[in-house]
């Protein structure tokens, strides 16, 4: 949008905040780092203002996605590309150097590098963010190797350095980090953070840098190789939450945690079962899905077919896809007949010549073409879009046939879903007055059902008559064998206290207190 930069510059006047971060090491051997929560309002809801070029960056990253990763193997450009940190709500404070220089950072379980702005960076953003000054630190050590990280809203580039990093009362010696000489984008100037501290695995660290958390464990600074997140979703309370390094705080959760093993070392990734809408299975994850617990992602991201079904159930307004309706009108009856004749669902779209493969690609790999305004500019893009819509139609029809719906009802339902197709990485609006009638959305993890109520997955922006309600669900498509993939961000982690067990390579979830 033409006025985007001017909007960003204008918004920065409203978004300067001070952080009173509390951190402590108690006599139970746990390190607690308090988090500050930023309340969503129309001025700081930046996710909806991300320029279309950022969506193109995401699409490019998805095309490069490494589908062959196994435990211990991953790609630097994977889930990190999803991130739009500008609408993140939770931040904490660290310090770098001797004497300590303070920085506000996002603690991000979905990436693994530590970066802050370099003193050598000169831009408008520098006036609103702390910068690391190596010349003022007696513990600084030069490295100089160049580094670059691609995010959803741009790239951070700079060079590696070494210095002591203070997290709470603990000091990590000679920690490698990136001094950023290029910030993510112009919109970074209105962000509430100065940098990012990754809590993922070294396998996805740019430059194979040793993460801060690894050094905490290696240097014997924590009681156990475990850390946990408690995010306070109570909008009336200022306290944002707490990260506990070295264990868990029983006051942060109720009952027992359900643990699942890490299946893809790199991210905190695990296997997940089906997704339910008001108790009814969607069927999409019957064959299994993967999920990543990601504190650096504000929303809850998942495959477009399921997100569209959720949007329909909650009345969210997305992007109307005429291409979707065209496929339903021309091929809907044929697809249904093939399903009723027990044809292989994975091969139906190739049988009717909408896909050029026989089920090996997987649903939604080319979904960016479905809603891309430029999809019609080339026959290849158009064909990919038709193929993706066909794949989604098969999934939706399978779900409806399981419920013994009539043919007419199924076709009408699929057309309604076409009207609810979300924008790539975009958010969808809902009627704030309809929250009480919206369904529960549930996730199956470790054989247990984890429910999200409407007030937990709908984000309210603003107050009174000007209040807006935004769906906490957004579309994100990764093909097999790595996908289908869900990103369980702050919407999920706010409802469920999350334990990241580095020693036993597992993730645990329990009801947050």
From Swiss-Prot:
Signal peptide: 1-24
Superkingdom of this protein's organism: Eukaryota
EC number: 3.4.23.-
Keywords assigned: Aspartyl protease, Disulfide bond, Glycoprotein, Hydrolase, Protease, Signal, Vacuole, Zymogen
Propeptide: 25-72
Domain Peptidase A1: 90-510
Catalytic residues as annotated in Swiss-Prot or TrEMBL: 108, 294
Protein name in UniProt: Aspartic proteinase
